[in-house]
């Protein structure tokens, strides 16, 4: 799976999202670019599970040096290495070990039930808090420190995405 030719955005308002970790999983997979495969990075040793399909936007470079992280709200989990055309609706701002590590929240373009969702304001506050709590707990259990700075709406996505695309070029 060579991602070098895959654009970060297939068309305006959408991103290409590569799933690394399906919703409900304790297995943490990461894309190994030099081999073009997903590898098992570690197994979380607690009851904490990923709340949504989690992955990255290819051909981007976030402040932490890796591709820009993204999550997609799905009714059913997909699988590691699945390509999803997704519509960003907001950003979870957090700092992991003192460095900014924003996470884009998306809905799948292929799900007509989510056609009308265009903003995190349309997502239940409890669901957004579940995502934030996952990252708090996940890092704490690993002995790390994470601070959740809060959610920003869809208007914050494009500047972050553009910055990460420019950093990758």
What are these regions (language model features)?
Residues 1-169:
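Hydrophobic N-terminal alpha-helices or hydrophobic patches in metabolic proteins across all domains
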């Amino acid at each position: 799976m060579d991602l070098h030719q895959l654009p970060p955005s297939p068309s305006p308002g959408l991103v290409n999202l590569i799933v690394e970790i399906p919703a409900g999983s304790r297995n943490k997979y990461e894309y190994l670019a030099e081999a073009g495969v997903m590898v098992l990075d570690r197994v979380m040793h607690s009851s904490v599970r990923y709340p949504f399909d989690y992955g990255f936007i290819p051909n981007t470079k976030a402040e932490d040096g890796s591709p820009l992280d993204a999550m997609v709200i799905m009714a059913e989990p997909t699988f590691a290495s699945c390509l999803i055309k997704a519509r960003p609706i907001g950003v979870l701002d957090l700092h992991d070990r003192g460095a900014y590590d924003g996470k884009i929240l998306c809905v799948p373009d292929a799900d007509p039930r989510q056609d009308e969702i265009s903003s995190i304001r349309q997502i239940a506050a409890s669901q957004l808090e579940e995502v934030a709590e996952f990252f708090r707990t996940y890092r704490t259990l690993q002995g790390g420190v994470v601070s959740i700075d809060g959610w920003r709406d869809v208007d914050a996505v494009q500047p972050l995405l553009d910055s990460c695309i420019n950093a990758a070029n």
